[in-house]
């Protein structure tokens, strides 16, 4: 049970750190952290939790990562559903805490997005469904390929969290304008269910695309990686 608790708290921290920075700090006039700050917040959230709970659960913090690790032969199917449930619940708990904080400011507007992921008119840059799909599939695929490589037996030990955190930062720098960056169904669900309406109606993409990308990334790594990994 400890590994499920670790995934709960790890995903809680990822959503609070990443989405919290987007909701509370990104748009502050003059002192706002902007896209770069949000990207760093997501990367740092994963990096810190990877060191904290990696030895307990592997610090997946993401249903797509869990699926990808299973496809890559690094994770048992029997633990897949409990991990995903723990991740989603942790994300939702963080979304609730973030809502309590954000709603304490006068003029707070939940309908403005609450760091939700979207496409079309709900894309930060007005990108289409097709662009959002390609972005999420490709970037999640590369994320999994790097995760599998960085955690392989041949990789330098102790550096995987840094590689993974920096990768997630780069992914956000690329795709915040496209979809607000998901690559993580739990992160998307964590805020979409509070916004409701369009955020929920578009949520399907941010489950389908990251999981598809994770599967493709894991299969790609199996082609180039060591079979004994």
Swiss-Prot record:
Record keyword Metal-binding present: no
Motif (NPA 2): 184-186
Annotated keywords: Cell inner membrane, Cell membrane, Membrane, Repeat, Transmembrane, Transmembrane helix, Transport
Catalytic activity entry: H2O(in) = H2O(out)
InterPro entries: Aquaporin-like, Aquaporin_transptr, Aquaporin_Z, MIP, MIP_CS
Keyword Ribonucleoprotein: no
Cited SUPFAM superfamilies: Aquaporin-like (SSF81338)
Site residues, Selectivity filter: 42, 172, 181, 187
Described function: Channel that permits osmotically driven movement of water in both directions. It is involved in the osmoregulation and in the maintenance of cell turgor during volume expansion in rapidly growing cells. It mediates rapid entry or exit of water in response to abrupt changes in osmolarity.
Domain remarks: Aquaporins contain two tandem repeats each containing three membrane-spanning domains and a pore-forming loop with the signature motif Asn-Pro-Ala (NPA).
Subunit record text: Homotetramer.
PANTHER family the UniProt entry points to: AQUAPORIN TRANSPORTER, MIP17260P
The name this protein goes by in its record: Aquaporin Z
Biological classification of the source: Bacteria, Pseudomonadati, Pseudomonadota, Gammaproteobacteria, Pseudomonadales
Gene field: aqpZ
